[in-house]
């Protein structure tokens, strides 16, 4: 099968087979709402046409798409349908080109919509002419196509453990980013050559099953079993979890340092924002939803619910606390202003209480409507448990001293409310209603 359109149709059905129309309506509605908010942001910030030519705009588009595609494709290779795809008479090049279109619609568009709205907004208010608008839309579209194809290529080399090719293409991409900053005239030709390399040379050989288990996975399976080690094993072997956590920690550090330099917020507010950003990192919070395929086995085994919960909580809270501590140390060292003791305790309370709430919410209302991990990571339901954490951050408005007492009390009330809800991961008395 060499026709890209039937393959694309199959891939979309794989993602949206159960609730295709509802998902399409949900995506369209989400894009409209996002567009309205971004237009309001552009107006509020007074962004003009000078921003279009800034280097950081192109770099942000390239890096954002590459990151999201890398995350999606590495997760995709863990799904059973990929093994079947490797056996079917499907053109590898056609498959990955079709997958690139699917990734743009399902993953990249809502995260890079700003780059397409900005020229249209400037055209609407008369700042850009029609020709200029088409130029910038074409330019952003070109870099979007390049970054998606590059992300597919890089992630496949990573999954298949072709380290030399991975480093080679990463070096080419780094040169593309440098050329965007220092030699803009060669950026587009260089991207075009790199895209041709991906489509002509690499894509035809990518539809092959990768190696199965890493050395770390083998070691963890041989060691004495524990749920705590099992969570670490899943985290280390899951590129989606690992990369999302690292990127969120790096973004939190960069964001806090920039806000501290500009003086927009004081130090305490910045560290609270860091806590909120780390806590919103959803892949490591869905520790019950991810157990969908092993749920019945875990229910039938003689396992105490509390034992499993505390193993997951130790892992989750440890990751959050470790990430915050690392960011706080780096930001404090660079800025020369270390975090105060009260602010540190306040942020630890937020993270530990938030982790407890998110994990409890996921246990009581797990999301089982996904067919592939890619659907779980990209779905809007992953933020549902985060909403229960918002009262904790509202408590910080009362001041540090008061919030230190209010945060644990608020967390206990929220957890008590969640525990009183019907259903849950271990409830077999009812059908799996959630997400189905």
Swiss-Prot record:
* Annotated organism of origin: Bacillus subtilis
The name of this protein is Antilisterial bacteriocin subtilosin biosynthesis protein AlbD
What does UniProt give as GO cellular component? plasma membrane
Give the primary localization class: membrane
* Membrane-spanning segments: 27-47, 51-71, 112-132, 134-154, 166-186, 187-207, 240-260, 270-290, 315-335, 395-415
Q: How does it sit in the membrane?
A: Multi-pass membrane protein
Keyword vocabulary terms for this entry: Antibiotic biosynthesis, Bacteriocin biosynthesis, Bacteriocin immunity, Cell membrane, Membrane, Transmembrane, Transmembrane helix
Described function: Involved in the production of the bacteriocin subtilosin. Required for immunity to subtilosin.
Localization per Swiss-Prot or TrEMBL? Cell membrane
Q: Which GO terms describe its biological process?
A: bacteriocin biosynthetic process; bacteriocin immunity
Where on the tree of life does the source sit, at the highest rank?
A: Bacteria
């Amino acid at each position: 099968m060499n026709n890209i359109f039937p393959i694309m149709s199959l891939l979309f059905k794989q993602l949206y087979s159960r609730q295709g129309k509802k998902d399409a309506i949900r995506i369209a509605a989400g894009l409209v709402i996002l567009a309205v908010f971004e237009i309001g942001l552009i107006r509020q910030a007074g962004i003009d046409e000078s921003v279009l030519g800034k280097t950081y705009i192109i770099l942000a588009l390239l890096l954002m798409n590459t990151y999201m595609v890398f995350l999606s494709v590495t997760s995709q290779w863990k799904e059973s349908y990929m093994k079947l795809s490797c056996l079917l008479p499907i053109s590898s090049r056609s498959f990955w080109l079709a997958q690139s279109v699917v990734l743009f619609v399902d993953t990249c568009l809502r995260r890079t919509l700003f780059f397409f709205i900005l020229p249209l907004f400037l055209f609407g208010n008369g700042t850009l002419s029609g020709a200029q608008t088409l130029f910038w839309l074409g330019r952003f579209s070109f870099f979007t196509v390049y970054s998606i194809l590059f992300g597919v290529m890089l992630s496949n080399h990573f999954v298949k453990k072709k380290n030399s090719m991975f480093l080679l293409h990463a070096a080419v991409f780094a040169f593309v980013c440098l050329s965007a900053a220092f030699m803009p005239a060669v950026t587009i030709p260089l991207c075009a050559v790199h895209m041709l390399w991906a489509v002509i040379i690499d894509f035809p050989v990518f539809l092959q099953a990768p190696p199965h288990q890493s050395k770390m996975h083998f070691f963890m399976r041989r060691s004495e079993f524990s749920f705590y080690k099992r969570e670490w094993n899943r985290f280390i072997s899951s590129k989606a979890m690992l990369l999302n956590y690292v990127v969120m920690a790096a973004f939190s550090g960069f964001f806090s340092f920039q806000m501290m330099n500009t003086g927009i917020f004081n130090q305490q507010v910045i560290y609270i924002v860091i806590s909120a950003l780390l806590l919103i990192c959803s892949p490591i919070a869905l520790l019950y939803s991810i157990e969908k395929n092993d749920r019945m086995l875990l229910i039938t085994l003689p396992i105490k619910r509390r034992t499993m919960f505390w193993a997951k909580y130790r892992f989750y809270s440890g990751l959050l606390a470790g990430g915050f501590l690392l960011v706080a140390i780096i930001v404090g060292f660079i800025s020369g202003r270390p975090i105060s003791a009260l602010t540190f305790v306040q942020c630890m309370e937020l993270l530990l209480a938030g982790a407890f709430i998110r994990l409890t919410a996921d246990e009581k209302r797990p999301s089982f409507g996904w067919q592939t991990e890619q659907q779980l990571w990209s779905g809007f339901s992953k933020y549902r448990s985060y909403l229960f954490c918002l009262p904790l951050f509202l408590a910080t408005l009362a001041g540090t001293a008061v919030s230190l007492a209010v945060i644990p009390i608020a967390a206990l009330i929220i957890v008590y409310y969640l525990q009183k809800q019907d259903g849950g991961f271990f409830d077999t008395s009812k059908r799996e209603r959630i997400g189905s």
